[in-house]
A protein has these predicted regions:
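ABC-family P-loop ATPase nucleotide-binding domain
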Residues: 1-13, 310-311
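ABC transporter nucleotide-binding domains
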Residues: 7, 14-207, 214
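Residues that form or flank phosphate/diphosphate-binding pockets in enzymes
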Residues: 72, 113, 216, 239, ...
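Conserved protein kinase catalytic domain
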Residues: 78, 119, 222, 304-305
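ABC transporter nucleotide-binding domain
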Residues: 176-265
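Short, charged/small-residue-rich alpha-helical element at the C-terminal edge
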Residues: 226-311
Length: 311
């Protein structure tokens, strides 16, 4: 086991009845790293978080946090980690300040002792310190939950979908806060269904139905996308999607924002040029007069789609 890694997982399996929640998960997360688990609902992200925070036992495999076994050393792990679950779980009938004081007391510390760690976050919620947590906005609840998870200065911070249901401005602010926390040496493991947030991580694991599809830096994952990616647009987008999928040269095609993202079976440069020309002719024959076809760079979401069995 590599001691430079704060989190180690080897062959982790977890089933809920007939549902395979986690299937042979092996990961190493380095000390001081901001690592992202990226995937849709049902990918296994929350189950993995619960195992690492000692709230759930794996069916098989081994996992350690800070060199401590998640089964044998669960008490010590709980003292060393901070956990912000996906659902707001603070005491809604306590005020902001009362929640912070309560969690500080649980860990035998005070707000003042670790104020330097939460200062940037606390100054944003301090004007509401007498307001009950249940009356806060989504963004303020998020900041309060993060402050409570940090109040004892954990070595590792687990954040389970912290930006779900939060407005875009608060999402950006939250990731900026994570960058500042990383600079203080805290190892951060964050999960999110938002593929666009992957670029804020040092490394990411793309997850689907309990499996890790790929683990690398965001740039590394994008570099594995080997096919030409085309963005195709028209006024008749619904009909266009069906026709693009029926085109003989199509490898994959899916709706993506205001365009359809298309990859081709042909991969050689000369062959692609010929197929694109054939695609234009094909669409003209289908009656399209306003189609635009643009070559684009793949996003993390495109890479995720390319890893799907049905893609």
């Amino acid at each position: 086991m590599n001691k430079s890694n704060t989190i180690n997982l080897s062959g982790i399996h977890k089933n809920y009845g007939k549902v395979n929640a986690l299937q042979d998960i092996s990961l190493d997360i380095k000390s001081g790293e901001l690592f992202g688990l990226i995937g849709p609902d049902g990918a296994g992200k929350t189950t993995l978080f619960r195992i690492l925070t000692t709230l759930l036992l794996p069916d098989s495999g081994k996992a350690s946090v800070c060199g401590l076994d998640v089964v044998r050393d669960y008490r010590e792990i709980r003292r060393r980690v901070g956990y912000m679950p996906g659902r707001f779980s603070l005491y809604q009938d306590l005020t902001v300040e009362e929640n912070l004081t309560f969690f500080a007391t649980v860990f035998n510390t005070t707000i003042e002792e670790n104020y330097d760690l939460i200062r940037d976050i606390y100054i944003q919620i301090e004007p509401f310190k007498t307001r009950k947590a249940g009356k806060l906005s989504g963004g303020m609840k998020q900041k309060l939950a993060l402050s409570c998870a940090l109040i004892h200065r954990p070595e590792v911070l687990f954040l389970d979908e912290p930006t779900t249901g939060v407005d875009p401005v608060s999402r950006v602010e939250f990731w900026d806060m994570l960058d500042r926390l990383k600079q203080q040496g805290i190892t951060i493991l964050v999960s999110t269904p938002y593929m666009d947030e992957a670029s804020r991580c040092d490394r990411i694991a793309l997850m689907r139905t309990g499996k890790c599809l790929s683990v690398d830096t965001p740039a590394g994952i994008r570099s594995t996308f080997s096919r030409l990616l085309l963005a195709v647009r028209s006024a008749s987008m619904y009909r266009l999607l069906e026709d693009l999928r029926a085109f003989p040269g199509t490898y994959s095609c899916y709706a993506f924002g205001d365009a359809h993202h298309l990859t081709l079976k042909e991969e050689s440069d000369a062959g692609v040029s010929s197929v694109v020309s054939g695609l234009e002719t094909y669409l003209q024959a289908k009656g399209y007069t306003d189609v635009s076809i643009e070559s684009i760079k793949p996003t993390i979401e495109d890479c995720f789609m390319a890893l799907q069995p049905e893609a």
